[in-house]
Regions:
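A short, proline-enriched helix->beta-strand linker immediately N-terminal to the Walker B motif
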Residues: 169-173
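Hydrophobic anchor residue at the start of the ABC signature
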Residues: 164
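ABC ATPase NBD coupling module
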Residues: 85-101, 122, 127-131, 248
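Conserved ABC ATPase signature
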Residues: 150-154, 158
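Conserved ABC ATPase "signature" region
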Residues: 117, 121, 128-146, 198
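The feature captures the beta-strand-to-loop junction immediately N-terminal to the Walker
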Residues: 54-56
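Catalytic Walker B motif of ABC-type/P-loop ATPase nucleotide-binding domains
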Residues: 175-178
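Helix-to-loop junction immediately C-terminal to a conserved catalytic motif
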Residues: 69
Length: 261
């Protein structure tokens, strides 16, 4: 079996995300305290793809995430989202990239529906449209009847549902997810993962999902990229709903070997 067992690397020029020969160094390289987080990384993500970035702590997942989000720029190389530089043209991506964090990051003085409306307010959507859109997504996430609850009145899983609703409500095409279910119990996380994948596919979104869990990567991704420090691709595999259980087990085994090496 090869590393492209199920499919060729599903990343081509013209995709939503392009990272070309990207290097990121924190501090001045060669000087004490400097750190090379990403090393000559090449990665493309196709439209509609659900990419799971998998790796141990410190392998550069969050640095890649932040470069795609336009929160930091590479030391060298090219980062493009829909053909544009997300760092240099940050304002052009308002409403086009949505982020779901590990914590829900809800404003405690706002109700659930007001928290979902926050992104829409920043996009200057008219108030009636904001409220209707926020309500629609809360209902889709199973929170109908909780629109006027404050975060402290909601469980951890419910709060994360609000944060996911907030991301979808902006109608952003690209969703960036930084271990959004890691703080939840497995039963709650499992249900949310399934709903999240369904909504991404139903609404034609592209998603990049950071995780350190092989099981979560296999459950969420239709492509998994395994990173080894400093953020080099050690394994890249794509699969789909027709991939057999035997093939998935072999992929799991191979990922385990790569991470242990």
């Amino acid at each position: 079996m090869t590393d492209t067992l199920v499919a060729e690397k599903a990343a081509t020029a013209g995709g939503v995300i392009h990272l070309g020969d990207v290097t990121k160094v924190f501090g001045k390289e060669g000087v004490a305290g400097s750190y090379r987080a990403v090393d000559h990384l090449n990665l493309d993500v196709a439209s509609g793809q659900m990419l799971a970035l998998l790796g141990k702590t410190g392998c550069g997942k969050s640095t890649i995430f932040n470069m795609i989000a336009g929160l930091t720029e590479p030391t060298a190389g090219t980062v493009r989202v829909n053909g544009k530089n997300p760092f240099a043209e940050f304002d052009a991506f308002r409403g086009k990239i949505a982020i779901v964090f590990q914590g829900d990051r809800l404003l405690p003085w706002r109700t659930a529906i007001q928290n979902v409306q926050l992104g829409l307010e920043m996009l200057d959507r008219p108030p009636p449209d904001r409220k209707d859109t926020a309500r629609k997504w809360l209902i889709k996430l199973g929170l109908g009847g909780h629109e006027d609850d404050y975060p402290h009145q909601l469980s951890g899983g419910m709060r994360q549902r609000v944060s996911i609703a907030r991301a979808f409500a902006t109608n952003a095409h690209l969703l960036l997810c930084d271990e959004p279910f890691s703080a939840l119990d497995e039963s709650t996380a499992g249900k949310l993962r399934g709903e999240f994948v369904r909504l991404v596919k139903e609404n034609g979104k592209t998603a990049v999902f950071i995780t350190h869990s092989i099981s979560e990567a296999l459950e969420i991704g239709d492509r998994i990229v395994v990173l080894k420090r400093p953020a080099m691709i050690a394994y890249d595999v794509s699969f789909d709903k027709d991939t057999s259980l035997e093939e998935r087990m072999m992929i799991r085994e191979r990922i385990g070997e790569v991470l242990a090496a």
